[in-house]
Amino acid sequence: IIPALVNGKYDVIMAGMSVTEERKKTISFSKAYMTEPARFFTLNSSPLSTFTSAKNLNLDDDSSATSGTISALNNAMKGMNIGVTVATIHEDFANKYLDSNLKVYPTQDEMNLDLAAGRIDAMLCDVGTAEAFMETSGGSNVVTFGPNVFGGLLGEGVGAGIRQGDADLKAMFDKAIADAAADGTISKISMQWFGKDLAP
């Protein structure tokens, strides 16, 4: 999707793309219009369902508490199969921090189905994405565990991807997002469609 933007196939990426330092080497981003942590999900019958940890894991914090939480996650998931979707910040996180067996999926739907069928032990994804699946009959046995994961390589939130050099277009998006955040529009839309406020 990024190469097609760079090559002029379209002007903006509006696909829930996280703003990361790595991506900013290739494209520009608008201000973030949404923020959402990542979490781990498993079946309610899994021993992982009772795993407890700190509420939040901020990857911008390099304290011993952060490394301790990551270590505890790795100990709990040792030898297990963990799913992530391809070319996402979740795959980046798993490659950097997890010692588990990683299974990479082309789509979230395929990963959801494998988790529900017990073909993987857990998955890592955005909270809202998994919660939508949990509200279906296929995901009714799925539960979350572990901390809210954010910061660091998980990025600064979700923004519109824009070609580097398209300063006028970026300015238009930045203003529209700032106005929509200030007047409550982003919060209202977020509550309507996600059931929670994901405004930055």
What is the role of each PLM region?
Residues 35-42, 127, 131-175, 196-200:
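Periplasmic-binding protein-like
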